[in-house]
A protein has these predicted regions:
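Glycine-rich phosphate/diphosphate-binding loop of Rossmann-like nucleotide-binding domains
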Residues: 2-38, 42
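Glycine-rich phosphate-binding loop
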Residues: 49-86
C-alpha cells in the first residue's frame, strides 16, 4: 500500500480546509488503496521542513498552502523560497510532491482556486502526486 503525506499550512485556515477537502475527495475515490496522514505546519515556509523530516516515511507528498500578496516583498520571498525548496526536495528524493500552494494577489483569487466546484488546486495537486506515484514516471 502506498503512503501519501499531506503537509498543510494553518495560515488562511478557511482556504486550506477547502484544499484539504479537494485532496480527500481525490484520495478517497482512487481505485488503489492509499494510506494518508495530514501534518499541519504554521505557514507555507515550514512546509519544506516538514516534508524533509518525513521523506523516509512516505512515498509521496501533497503540499497545501496559501500566500496572498500584501504591501511588502514578503509574498515574493515566501512564495519563491518555499516552491524552490519543494522542487529541490522532490528532485533529490525522487519522490513526487503535488504542489497545492496558492500564490494569489487577493483572497478572492485564493477562494476561487480552492473552491471544490471550480478549480480546486488541492484536487490538482493530489492527482499529480498520484499519477507520478502510481505510474512511476
Amino acid at each position: 500500500m502506498k503512503k501519501i503525506c499531506i503537509v498543510a499550512s494553518k495560515y488562511y485556515e478557511d482556504i486550506i480546509n477547502m484544499l484539504v477537502s479537494g485532496v480527500n475527495d481525490v484520495l478517497n475515490n482512487h481505485k488503489k488503496k492509499i494510506k494518508t496522514k495530514i501534518i499541519y505546519v504554521p505557514g507555507v515556509f515550514e512546509i519544506p521542513y516538514a516534508i524533509s523530516k518525513n521523506l523516509k516515511k512516505y512515498d509521496a507528498f501533497i503540499a497545501l498552502g496559501c500566500v496572498i500578496k500584501g504591501e511588502t516583498p514578503h509574498f515574493d520571498f515566501i512564495s519563491k523560497s518555499s516552491i524552490d525548496a519543494i522542487i529541490k526536495l522532490s528532485i533529490e528524493s525522487k519522490k513526487p510532491i503535488g504542489n497545492g500552494i496558492l500564490t494569489c494577489l487577493n483572497k478572492n483569487q485564493a477562494i476561487e482556486r480552492a473552491d471544490k466546484s471550480n478549480k480546486n488546486k488541492g484536487k490538482e495537486a493530489a492527482n499529480a502526486a498520484i499519477e507520478l506515484l502510481i505510474n512511476d514516471n
